[in-house]
């Protein structure tokens, strides 16, 4: 067990790691479209309208998600303003709270500060957690509520005090209710399918029958006011959200983001870096101790069952398995601390060598792509970015070697492998990536034209939300492609916000009498601009393009 001085040093180092990797780079990195610009704009419009009940995007009804995740982003923008830091801070905050909850859960399970500290550090330094936790999506919020729900579930199973058990199930319901208002019915399904094998194996079914209704009551109590409010405001919301967003997305043949069953295996392998060397041992240890150690069986079910559930679903995205990383971090922490305790340092040294290999592999690939192959990531003028990337991954390998050379004694140093990568990634992205996925610079370059435009049209929803966020205006028209706004654009009061190629010439002739018209495109690499009326100004930067039509009498 750690002494007080070691605890203070460990807490300081973890806080330093969190500040350097999670907070410092936030504002300096451009926003990615379509996700980050979408959530930035939704919250900006919510704050502008003062309506926290019905989500809108570009002043068009947007029913893909409930509102609790937006509320967190709203508060962030309300405190920090309209900037990239505020857009991402909600995600960072949720990862931070999740790490604290995992520390507390580890203490509940093992009463060992070393394991608890290692759990939190491993969690926040996992590549998947870091990548999603510094990216503005709703998954960190959803993962927070799932983590809190599972902590309450364990608390309810462990305590012998009836009063505390009642409290645990009531808080469990509150967490599920907030998770439901963040990402829908998944927040209710995940804790249930995880706890089912646990209570059956531990013969606690009667406890769930007796106390489970308390969780249901508290979940309904916290979510019902908003459920009723949005049903009164938008009667069609629940039809769309249940049938389209849940049933169609996860089970139908035309579900979004269809991927094979094994899709999450490579995602998981990459996601646990820089702790990949601990993955096999941690899972095997949990499986071997499933009978003798109820805590390990609890974590194993929490990790495996949602992973299988999301693998069976037809629609898949890397962000979906973020809730699986919390139990995996705890399993790895227990495995690592037990290795030190039992003198099995060679198992920890393996993780160091894995990071040496990963750092060296990244350096070789970067060097080969620029020097040997014809598939260069960077342009010749971007040599400094190339050097930055090589240095970052070189330091990754060096830290991995230190973990190995020091005989695994300082195995937790592996967390710092990615620290330089996190600091430089925003400055080391190739220009072709910036000019295809991060439109803020392109929009700022054409700020004058856009600011003086009476109408702005966009062929891409991601580009439309980027313009809306940068220009602080939500009256962007969709051009030819409906995208994710199709459902909202079909409402009678929003149909005028869609212009097709066929109708554009006639619409343009009328619109130019009112003022300048700007049309934005997000093209494929070699795609040509469509055949449209001749513009007064055309500008293209790799995949982004703008056509400007000046006002005519």
Swiss-Prot record:
Q: How does it sit in the membrane?
A: Multi-pass membrane protein
Identify the GO cellular component terms for this protein: plasma membrane
* Stored InterPro entries: ArnT_tfrase, Glyco_trans_39/83, LipidA_mod_glycosyltrf_83
GO biological process terms, alphabetically, are: lipid A biosynthetic process; lipopolysaccharide biosynthetic process; protein O-linked glycosylation; response to iron(III) ion
User: Would I find Lipid biosynthesis among this entry's keywords?
Assistant: yes
Give, as in the UniProt entry, the pathway in which the protein acts: Lipopolysaccharide metabolism; 4-amino-4-deoxy-beta-L-arabinose-lipid A biosynthesis
Which chemical reaction does it catalyze? Answer: 4-amino-4-deoxy-alpha-L-arabinopyranosyl di-trans,octa-cis-undecaprenyl phosphate + lipid IVA = lipid IIA + di-trans,octa-cis-undecaprenyl phosphate
**Family in the record:** Belongs to the glycosyltransferase 83 family.
Q: What is this protein called?
A: Undecaprenyl phosphate-alpha-4-amino-4-deoxy-L-arabinose arabinosyl transferase
Native organism is: Photorhabdus laumondii subsp. laumondii (strain DSM 15139 / CIP 105565 / TT01)
Q: What is the lineage of its organism?
A: Bacteria, Pseudomonadati, Pseudomonadota, Gammaproteobacteria, Enterobacterales
């Amino acid at each position: 067990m750690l002494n007080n001085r070691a605890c203070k040093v460990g807490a300081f180092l973890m806080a330093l790691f969190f500040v350097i990797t999670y907070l410092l780079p936030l504002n300096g990195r451009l926003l990615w479209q379509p996700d980050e610009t979408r959530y930035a704009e939704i919250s900006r419009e919510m704050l502008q309208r003062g309506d926290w009940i019905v989500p809108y995007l570009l002043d068009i009804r947007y029913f893909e998600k409930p509102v609790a995740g937006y509320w967190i982003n709203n508060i962030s923008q309300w405190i920090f303003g309209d900037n990239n830091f505020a857009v991402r801070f909600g995600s960072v905050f949720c990862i931070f709270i999740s790490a604290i909850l995992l520390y507390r859960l580890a203490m509940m399970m093992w009463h060992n500060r070393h394991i608890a500290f290692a759990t939190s550090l491993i969690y926040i330094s996992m590549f998947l957690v870091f990548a999603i936790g510094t990216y503005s999506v709703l998954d960190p919020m959803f993962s927070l509520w799932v983590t809190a729900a599972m902590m309450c579930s364990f608390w309810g199973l462990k305590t012998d005090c009836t009063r505390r058990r009642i409290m645990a199930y009531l808080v469990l319901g509150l967490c599920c209710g907030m998770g439901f208002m963040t990402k829908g019915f998944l927040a209710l399904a995940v804790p249930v399918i995880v706890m089912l094998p646990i209570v059956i194996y531990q013969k606690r079914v009667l406890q769930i029958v007796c106390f489970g209704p308390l969780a249901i009551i508290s979940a309904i109590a916290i979510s019902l006011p908003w459920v009723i409010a949005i049903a009164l405001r938008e009667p069609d919301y629940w039809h769309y959200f249940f049938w389209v967003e849940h049933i169609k997305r996860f089970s139908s043949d035309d579900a979004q983001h269809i991927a094979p069953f094994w899709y999450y295996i490579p995602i998981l392998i990459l996601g646990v870096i820089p702790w990949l060397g601990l993955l096999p041992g941690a899972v095997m240890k949990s499986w071997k101790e499933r009978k003798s150690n109820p805590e390990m069986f609890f974590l194993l079910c929490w990790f495996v069952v949602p992973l299988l559930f999301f693998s069976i679903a037809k629609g898949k995205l890397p962000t979906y398995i973020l809730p699986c990383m919390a139990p995996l971090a705890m399993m790895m922490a227990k495995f690592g601390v037990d290795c030190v305790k039992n003198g099995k340092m060679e198992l920890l040294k393996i993780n160091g060598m894995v990071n040496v290999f990963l750092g060296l592999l990244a350096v070789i690939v970067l060097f080969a792509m620029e020097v040997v192959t014809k598939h260069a990531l960077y342009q010749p003028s971007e040599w400094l970015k190339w050097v930055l990337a090589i240095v970052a991954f070189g330091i990754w390998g060096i830290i991995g070697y230190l973990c190995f050379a020091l005989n695994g004694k300082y195995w937790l140093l592996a967390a710092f492998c990615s620290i330089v990568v996190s600091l430089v990634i925003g400055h080391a992205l190739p220009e072709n990536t910036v000019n295809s996925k991060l439109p803020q610079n392109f929009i700022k370059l054409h700020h004058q034209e856009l600011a003086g435009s009476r109408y702005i049209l966009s062929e891409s929803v991601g580009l439309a939300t980027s313009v809306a966020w940068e220009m602080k205006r939500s009256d962007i028209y969709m051009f030819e492609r409906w995208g994710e706004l199709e459902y909202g654009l079909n409402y009678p009061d929003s149909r005028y916000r869609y212009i097709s190629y066929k109708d554009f010439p006639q619409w343009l002739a009328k619109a130019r009498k009112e003022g300048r018209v700007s049309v934005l495109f997000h093209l494929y690499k070699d795609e040509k601009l469509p055949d449209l009326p001749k513009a007064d100004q055309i500008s293209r930067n790799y995949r982004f393009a703008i056509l400007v039509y000046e006002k005519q009498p």
